[in-house]
């Protein structure tokens, strides 16, 4: 089945429908991801030394989409790549599949989510990939602040907030507070139904894609 939409593939198609690849990557064919899972630990160590890894308990790497002569590939870069990639982890089995499925369930519940998909490594193992929403197509930064920043909590206290505190923060900083509070409540109910016990302060953000600050589409959703 297609790793993006979960629908059946036609004969000769591999991993993605051409339309799904175009929708997510902007290319007719799936970009090459020429890394094996066994190489990722060493690569992660290199990027940590270079301070190019992204924050969070789940391993994350930043990827850039490079297009050359009709062939496109995803390469590990610094912090500001086009995509965020999460590989398999020994601590939690099939975590990429869990996250992608939960994001699909959220979409089915009419919750706005960031663009996301599964993608296959060179050795056949699956990883989770999501498109960054804090960058414009020209690479210019979009203002985005998570609830740790907005409530002045250091990252190590990301589990110390409350839903009441987050709701008050949305009311204070959002330019569309009533709409965002309604969307936030819908997301909370979804997390309760799916058993998500990891909705900490860094998993909720406000951003300014145009003139106004608003709640971002949902991201980092799990059923654990």
Language-model segments: which ranges?
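Short coil/turn linker and secondary-structure boundary residues
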Residues: 35, 142, 158-161, 176-179
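Generic detector of well-ordered alpha-helical segments enriched in charged/polar residues
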Residues: 3, 18-22, 41, 45, ...
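Charged, low-complexity, helix/coiled-coil-prone segments
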Residues: 2-6, 34-54, 111-114, 125-133, ...
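Conserved ATP-binding subdomain of kinase catalytic cores across diverse folds
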Residues: 39-158
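Short, flexible segments with low predicted structural confidence
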Residues: 34-35, 77-78, 172, 176
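Generic secondary-structure transition motif, activating predominantly at the C-termini of alpha-helices
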Residues: 9, 24-28, 48, 134, ...
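Regulatory N- and C-terminal appendages and interdomain linkers associated
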Residues: 1-38, 212-215
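Conserved kinase catalytic-core segment
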Residues: 91-107, 162-224
């Amino acid at each position: 089945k297609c790793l993006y939409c979960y629908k059946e593939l036609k004969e000769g198609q591999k991993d993605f429908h051409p339309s799904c690849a175009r929708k997510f990557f902007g290319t007719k064919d799936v970009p090459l991801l020429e890394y094996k899972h066994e190489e990722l630990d060493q690569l992660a160590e290199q990027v940590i030394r270079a301070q190019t890894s992204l924050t969070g308990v789940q391993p994350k790497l930043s990827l850039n989409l490079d297009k050359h002569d009709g062939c496109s590939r995803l390469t590990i870069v610094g912090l500001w790549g086009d995509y965020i990639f999460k590989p398999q982890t020994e601590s939690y089995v099939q975590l990429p599949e869990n996250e992608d499925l939960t994001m699909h369930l959220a979409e089915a519940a009419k919750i706005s989510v960031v663009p996301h998909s599964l993608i296959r490594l060179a050795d056949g193992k699956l990883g989770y990939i999501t498109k960054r929403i804090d960058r414009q197509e020209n690479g210019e930064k979009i203002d985005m602040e998570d609830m740790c920043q907005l409530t002045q909590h250091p990252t190590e206290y990301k589990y110390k907030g409350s839903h009441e505190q987050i709701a008050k923060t949305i009311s204070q900083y959002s330019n569309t507070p009533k709409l965002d509070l309604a969307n936030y409540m819908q997301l909370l109910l979804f997390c309760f139904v799916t058993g998500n016990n990891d909705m900490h302060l860094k998993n909720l953000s406000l951003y300014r894609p145009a003139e106004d600050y608003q709640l971002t589409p949902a991201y980092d959703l799990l059923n654990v």
